[in-house]
Curated annotation (Swiss-Prot):
<dbReference type="InterPro" id="IPR001717">
    <property type="entry name" value="Anion_exchange"/>
</dbReference>
<feature type="transmembrane region" description="Helical">
    <location>
        <begin position="828"/>
        <end position="848"/>
    </location>
</feature>
<keyword id="KW-0050">Antiport</keyword>
<dbReference type="GO" id="GO:0051453">
    <property type="term" value="P:regulation of intracellular pH"/>
</dbReference>
<keyword id="KW-0812">Transmembrane</keyword>
<dbReference type="InterPro" id="IPR013769">
    <property type="entry name" value="Band3_cytoplasmic_dom"/>
</dbReference>
<keyword id="KW-0039">Anion exchange</keyword>
<dbReference type="GO" id="GO:0086001">
    <property type="term" value="P:cardiac muscle cell action potential"/>
</dbReference>
<feature type="transmembrane region" description="Helical">
    <location>
        <begin position="1104"/>
        <end position="1124"/>
    </location>
</feature>
<dbReference type="Pfam" id="PF07565">
    <property type="entry name" value="Band_3_cyto"/>
</dbReference>
<feature type="transmembrane region" description="Helical">
    <location>
        <begin position="864"/>
        <end position="884"/>
    </location>
</feature>
<keyword id="KW-0813">Transport</keyword>
<feature type="compositionally biased region" description="Acidic residues">
    <location>
        <begin position="67"/>
        <end position="76"/>
    </location>
</feature>
<dbReference type="GO" id="GO:0005452">
    <property type="term" value="F:solute:inorganic anion antiporter activity"/>
</dbReference>
<feature type="topological domain" description="Cytoplasmic">
    <location>
        <begin position="1"/>
        <end position="656"/>
    </location>
</feature>
<keyword id="KW-1003">Cell membrane</keyword>
<keyword id="KW-0406">Ion transport</keyword>
Amino acid sequence: MGRSYNEKDFEYHRHTFHHTHHPLSTHLPPQRFRKRVLSMDRRRKRKRKKKKTSMPPSDVTPTIHEVDEEEAESEIEGQCQAATPTEPSEELPQLSLGSEEDLAADLPLSSFHMESERPASSEETLPSPASMEEKEETQQPPDGGEHKDISNSFSPSPEAASMTTRGWFRRKPVHRLAGAQRTSYDLRERICIGSMTAMETAVYQKVPTDEAEAQMLASADLDDMKSHRFEDNPGVRRHLVKKSSRCQLPRSSNGSPPLSSLKRRKRMDKKTHEVFVELNELIVDKNQEMRWKERARWIKFEEDVEEETDRWGKPHVASLSFRSLLELRRTITHGAIMLDLDQSTLPGIAHLMVETMIISDQIRAEDRANVLRALLLKHSHPNDEKEGLFHRNHSVTSLGSFRHNHNHVHDTSLPLVSQDHEEMHDSKAAEHDKEKSLHPIPAEGHAASRSLKLLAKIPKDAEATVVLVGCVEFLEKPAMAFVRLNESILLESILEVPVPIRFIFVLLGPTQTNVDYHEIGRSFSTLMSDKNFHEVAYFADDRQDLLNGINEFLDCSIVIPPSDVEGKDLLKTVASFQKQMLRKRKERELKKCASTVTGAELETKDVNIEEQEEEDQFDVDPLKRSGIPFGGLIHDIRRRYPRYISDLKDALDTQCIAAVIFIYFAALSPTITFGGLLGEKTQGMMGVSELIISTATVGVLFSLLAGQPLLIIGFSGPLLVFEEAFYKFCQAQGFEYLTGRVWIGFWLIFIVLVIVAAEGSFLVRYISPFTQEIFAFLISLIFIYETFSKLIKVFQEHPLMMSYTSAAFKHSDQRGSSVIGEPILNQPNTALLSMVLMMGTFFTAFFLRKLRNSRFLGGKVRRVIGDFGIPISILISVLVDILIPDTYTQKLNVPSGFSVTSPDKRGWFISPFGDKQPFPVWMMGASVIPALLVFILIFMETQITTLIVSKKERRLMKGSGFHLDLLLIVTLGAICPLFGLPWLTAATVRSVTHVNALTVMSKATAPGEKPMIQEVKEQRVTGMCVAILVGLSIVMTDVLRHIPLAVLFGIFLYMGITSLTGIQLYERITLMVTPAKHHPDHVYVTKVKTWRMNMFTVIQLLCIVLLWVVKSTVASLAFPFILIMTVPLRRLILTRIFEERELAALDADEDSPNFDEDGRDEYNEIHMLV
């Protein structure tokens, strides 16, 4: 029966003097006796000269003297001084414990002599095999003298021998004395397995090393020797210390830097990588063969394999059981932790994992081969069977190379970690030898192409984590091992995609236990996908760091009570509660970092601040006033024009070609629509031809000179409203309409120069969503009203009658086109067909837009159809009109070739002093008032569009040009009236669509995660090409003449209604008639009382009513002035009615850009019109 130890034995051992054991470091030789590290050549030469002697077992018990450490050192010094100077003095071998050199090379065997020792005879000597080889190689000298050991430079006298023995005892630990048969100490023999300390089956229990020890030591001494040799006390006193879980690092020599500096340097060299986690479970397939099958994967969210269909499910947030997390923490507490393991092959990793499990008493030594065989089973993934003739490159590794090293006999003469594996650590060439690799990279085939889509979603520098869980029958209790490799390695047969592996987690156990291995594997996989625990896993120094990471994860986790949840609405508060916890967590981290800032960190922070200032030179606020005239303009020019060459080179991309085609149709449709309506409003003074030429000319010049060339210049609804109001004013006052526009243009140049010189673009900050929503809502109502008013006018001109006379058909030709000259009235079916064309165009464009965000067809097909919704709807309506030739419809009035809309009314040049009558002088000066009103409209639309495009979420790197763009648009627009061309502005929806078309989304986006912008093709070529193509459309006059005006009214209706749906004001109006229990969880609903929210909505509606009244009277020109007055209303009056908290919720620009192709809608991102 073996003796069992308890705490009393340990306490007795601590306080007993003759059982005191010093740390290993106290037994090292003094510094002057240590051997210098020699080169490999000199070391080989010395090895040939060495002779090892063996000492026979002594029949007489040797006397071991207990001396103080100071006395022993003084005796050693005296012994060294007594050495004969004629004999070559050799230093003692260096005893650097734990170094790689000592482990790789054989240590010299030092002989020693005891006081009662007699000369050894050949009959009594039992030499070791190593000593026998040495004797065969070494010949005895002719004089019969004894061979001198290299470590002993002289033959000592008995007194000297006693001194030598005592000195040697102080340098060598007493419990390492192995007697005559054991004259060497190999560091590898310190590695022992946990089963060696088992009391019942201990191989070394009370067994001395030689006969001398058996004679001299008592039972207590033998027990103490066993404790020192086979228990976990590496160089410490008898108090229990938990061993670090980090893999044993080689200790450096005296000349190397200290270990603390190495750890610090290693920590600085580390960096975290993106994560890819794969969970494999051990199963038995239909052929009764065991294999690893992939059950789930994590890039950011969890994706599970559906067992019935063997396909991937939708990504979701992993829901974990609290019990599995606690079991995981307990498993890591008692499992094997191997950090910074230096291995490059799966067999090598599996071998060390199994040995560590044996040492930590998790598995028996008899289970070594079974566990190793299980770890090296092949891996399967979903849809592997569907690959046909192209099979995966599985790892079918033979275990024969391991069986000869893993017999079940406890051969203690061999180290548990074989020399082959030690050499594998140092063989760099074998690590990169693809011919000898067990996991070659598969050739390009079906398997590689199948995983290409998933590989594109994983970041390039990602490192994988493999989680292996399963049940096995041969284990008695669960066994766990966690491995962090020193460097990531590519094991192609393990993962579904070729991603280098950095972490491996293994959990095997019997089926009888009440442990759910699958849930524990999911828990650890979710932990590794968590950003904070992922960093902990990279920088962990021991087991406790991992446990602290789990505790921190538990602190930020949410526990849902075990109740039946019916409906998703009951879980809505979980997301908001989670956000609050994460925000508090970040605040705690910031406070902790602020309180632990050291002087060195302050210095590095100063350096980082300087670097950040250098990087943010181009990110200076463009609306910040410099205090000097034209300071903002100069800043825009200095920032943008040096990048002019890159603006041209960046256009050499296929995505720019696709953007040109798309934006051309997106810009042409509104141009034709507004041109036709403008011709209707101005009685042909300006129409489609003028608008096409103006758009092309100004667009090309703006693209070449702009600070933000991604803006699309075009006509807009507010300008159309102003043109109609100014035309009515001139008709009522008897002024020439086109001449008045010329003088407005002159004043526009003066106004814009004053504003740009004063850096007045900063005023756009005061135009809040309160004003934008009023403006957009008013224009949408005007669009809708004008559409139905035109339809009513068609019904009035072509009423529905019971019968029609033959005279009604005399003004129509065979195709239904009108004969120019006199108006055509009372045409049969004209009103009905016009209504059908208008509503058909509207519904076609509207539902094609809805199709883009639906789940039908593929994503790219839906995007193309949705982007070209307006041209498709126009084409369909025109074809319907052509197929009904017997019914008259009013067509678009477009002249042939390069001509004005009404050549009989005007020419290409407009005289500033009047054409048919002199223009009044006082009106020349009074034109400053309408010029100021036009400038308000252009300023608002241009600057708000630039503000939307320049949002940080869009990641535009080349900046914006608030001052430069405003100067160019207003100046070019002021020159246009000299040629009878309309003013232009930055079209909001077209500009946002242009930027979206040039945005390159990152393909490395985890499933379920919001798409991230990789880059935006910021260049000048696409805008210029779009403008040129629009200008070339003037030759399409024969095609444009077939477009009925009713189709344009349908597009007008589409613009009005789609603009309303993206305005928050419209949503709050619907909430006024919606019960409170059905209100959505928006900020302006949850943070503001319902009646106060309704009051804010009513104030906006009153402003809209006032603007509508002004617009409907003779003072319609003043509606831009009334509109701009809503800015001081919001800043001065509403702040006295509402609290700042309420205004922040009601008047906040909370709409962030949506970059998801399936849900992107430009109308929902902006408050302005097309």
